[in-house]
Amino acid sequence: MSKRRLAPLTFLRRLLFRTLVALVVFWGGGIALFSVVPVPFSAVMAERQISAWLSGEFGYVAHSDWVSMEDISPWMGLAVMAAEDQKFPEHWGFDVLAIEKALAHNERNESRIRGASTLSQQTVKNLFLWDGRSWVRKGLEAGLTLGIETVWSKKRILTVYLNIAEFGDGIFGVEAAARRYFNKPASRLNMTEAALLAAVLPNPLRYKADAPSGYVRSRQSWILRQMRQLGGESFMTRNQLY
């Protein structure tokens, strides 16, 4: 093969390598920076903002009001763990048993796909990654999840998650959600309110905290039972999450 034919292939390989290096540096820097600095924006916020602009909604502003864990009701952290990831204090980013159960379920029910993402994985997806499903994205998700689990404390992961999670159309973070739905700061959320917010997390654009469907109410009740079974507020302090 001539040098002329090799040149474009060599260029593409170098470009791909440099792009990967740049992304690793970017994401690695983000993990290090956000271990101590409040997160100002997330990938999901950027996606919603761009979508709004393309739709002509120029008044739409995606943002969250950052609050520390000390300014968030302990019920809220407990509620999202009860709803999404009860083994959060124990695992290193992945719940192997939940993944196995999800795979078995999905083989039997192709029309109803069940996920098994931990809070750590959800934090990575919300903060760093684009929407969609692909092996490349899954690989990046796994690497970044290990990254935050290594660099951040569990308390930090939970804090970031609660500050960037989407709780409704244009409502990002638990502080904005508490003020929008209950007219109070996140620090004053009670057990029932926290469970309601956690109940919409599977699909916050479909399920509404201000107009909860029967499914949302049923899920809220289930979350409340799980919160009690975990041990209530003591679960947070026992695992150094508050």
Swiss-Prot record:
UniProt cross-references to InterPro entries, sorted A to Z: Glyco_trans_51, Lysozyme-like_dom_sf, PBP_transglycosylase, Pep_trsgly
Pathway participation: Cell wall biogenesis; peptidoglycan biosynthesis
Gene Ontology CC annotations of this record: peptidoglycan-based cell wall; plasma membrane
Entry annotated with the keyword Transmembrane: yes
Compartments, record wording: Cell inner membrane
EC number: 2.4.99.28
Single GO BP term: peptidoglycan biosynthetic process
UniProt GO MF annotations: pentosyltransferase activity; peptidoglycan glycosyltransferase activity
Protein name per its UniProtKB record: Biosynthetic peptidoglycan transglycosylase
Lineage per the UniProt record: Bacteria, Pseudomonadati, Pseudomonadota, Gammaproteobacteria, Enterobacterales
